[in-house]
A protein has these predicted regions:
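Acidic, metal/ion-coordinating pockets
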Residues: 1-321
Length: 321
């Protein structure tokens, strides 16, 4: 028996605070069959959900982003089984807004991972059994603003030793351990040498898959020691006033298939889509656009295993960016 898990990229409501469950159904209508066909759906919620007057913008570099409690209807309409909160915006309005967000998710029976009222909670794994397969999902982000520490609430900031210990701990109780990582260089279609080595290290420490995002563009994927690493999914729903790059509204869902009878067989299938800001709709690609995008994903994936070429691309990107 196989288990199909969908990993979706960044979901943010900064310029769409009005989105509720009914609006979400319209936004997601073209994606309905894809979402419904999965056994498990995992989405990155990249903003707190709190009403006006709860929380205040923290001091940070970059925008402070917040959604409203009604926006949880998007996750419900999408059938979200796990909300990933480990990212650089979940703490944008401080601890009170994060606490409110956790309450909203609890009220709507949406499990979450990657943030909490303290560091231990933020690093807690989400465990689930589906189709006779037990999974542990861990989620961490790069150490920017809004991360947890000690008894301070926030997202799970990356700590290799702590994460390695958690992977080992979860391997004792689950068949598969998946790490969702929020990090990378924005708008770069190739992962940095640091990200590549970091995610490969997690596989060597026991992660059965690493699924990453944050770059606001698609990056490729590879199999390392027979384990899939997806370097960036791109945005899923992230409408913006003035997107700075054409890549902003393009992405892919990573469908991870686990064969329960062949534990070494974990397969990734990219499902590309596009968000149309005028129609306010996410649609799977088809025809020539689908073929072109799949070839593009294949091309940017082929260079990843090479030890030298991605480094040369990265250095060039650093110069021109």
């Amino acid at each position: 028996m196989s288990l199909k898990i969908l990993f979706c990229g960044d979901v943010c409501f900064k310029v769409q605070p009005e989105v509720d469950r009914e609006a979400a159904k319209r936004i997601l209508a073209p994606m309905r069959d894809i979402l419904c066909a999965a056994d498990l759906r995992v989405m990155n919620l990249e903003c707190p959900l709190a009403p006006e007057g709860v929380g205040a913008p923290i001091y940070k570099s970059g925008p402070n982003i917040i959604g409203r409690p009604r926006n949880v209807g998007f996750l419900e309409a999408a059938g979200c089984d796990v909300a990933v909160l480990a990212n650089n915006h979940i703490g944008d309005y401080g601890g009170d807004a994060l606490t409110y967000t956790l309450g909203v998710l609890d009220e709507h029976s949406i499990p979450y991972v990657g943030a909490g009222e303290n560091l231990d909670e933020a690093y807690s794994a989400y465990r689930i059994v589906r189709g006779g397969v037990s999974l542990s999902i861990l989620a961490v982000c790069e150490n920017e603003f809004g991360t947890a520490s000690g008894d301070r609430s926030g997202a799970a900031g990356f700590d290799l030793e702590r994460l390695g210990d958690k992977i080992e701990e979860e391997k004792e109780v689950s068949d598969f351990v998946i790490v969702v990582f929020h990090g990378g260089c924005e708008y770069n279609p190739l992962p940095s040498p640091l990200c590549r080595e970091r995610y490969r290290t997690l596989v060597r420490l026991g992660a059965d898959a690493v699924i990453a995002g944050h770059t606001h563009c698609m990056q490729g994927y590879e199999y390392y020691h027979d384990r899939p690493i997806v370097y960036s999914l791109g945005n899923f729903l992230f409408k913006w006033d003035k997107p700075s790059r054409p890549s902003w509204y393009h992405g892919y869902i990573a469908q991870l298939t686990i064969d329960a009878e062949s534990p070494r067989q974990l397969m990734i299938r990219p499902i590309p889509y596009v968000f149309d800001p005028d129609k306010n709709e996410i649609s799977p690609l088809a025809g020539d656009k689908l073929e072109h995008t799949l070839r593009y994903i294949e091309r940017i994936s082929l260079v990843i295993p090479d030890m030298d070429e991605p480094t040369r691309y990265y250095k060039g990107w650093c110069i021109i960016s």
